[in-house]
């Protein structure tokens, strides 16, 4: 099979049939795509009074949160994000210590 799309429910990562174990790199990539905002929106950064805009294809998280979610050391999260950035798969911006991850070409996914 060499193309096309598959529709995946965003809740797949919460299904109780799957073990709660460290994510593979591919699972992290799919998780980021599934978690990205599907529309432009205005959000409040958790535990702050900061309100900011989030764009379609962006995901907001700290590296610490991602490390906990993926069951990875923070250093591995940073290295993987850097690798995806160098491959132009995503970009990042930081607002008040919170990283906004932009999935490049989000509409293709």
Q: Where are these predicted regions, by residue range?
A:
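Generic secondary-structure boundary/loop-capping signal
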Residues: 5, 9-10, 40, 56, ...
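Generic structural "secondary-structure junction" signal
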Residues: 8-10, 14, 45-47, 105
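Long, low-complexity, charged/polar intrinsically disordered regions in eukaryotic proteins
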Residues: 1-34
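Winged helix-turn-helix DNA-binding recognition segment
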Residues: 18-19, 36-102
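Short, amphipathic alpha-helical interaction segments positioned at domain boundaries
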Residues: 69, 107-109
């Amino acid at each position: 099979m060499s193309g096309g799309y598959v529709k995946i429910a965003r809740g797949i990562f919460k299904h109780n049939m799957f073990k709660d174990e460290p994510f593979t790199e591919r699972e992290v990539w799919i998780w980021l795509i599934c978690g990205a905002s599907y529309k432009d929106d205005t959000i409040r950064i958790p535990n702050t009074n900061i309100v900011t805009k989030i764009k379609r294809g962006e995901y907001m998280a700290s590296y610490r949160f991602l490390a906990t979610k993926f069951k990875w050391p923070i250093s591995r999260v940073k290295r993987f994000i850097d690798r995806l950035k160098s491959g132009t798969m995503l970009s990042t911006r930081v607002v008040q210590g919170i990283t906004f991850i932009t999935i490049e070409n989000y509409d293709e996914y």
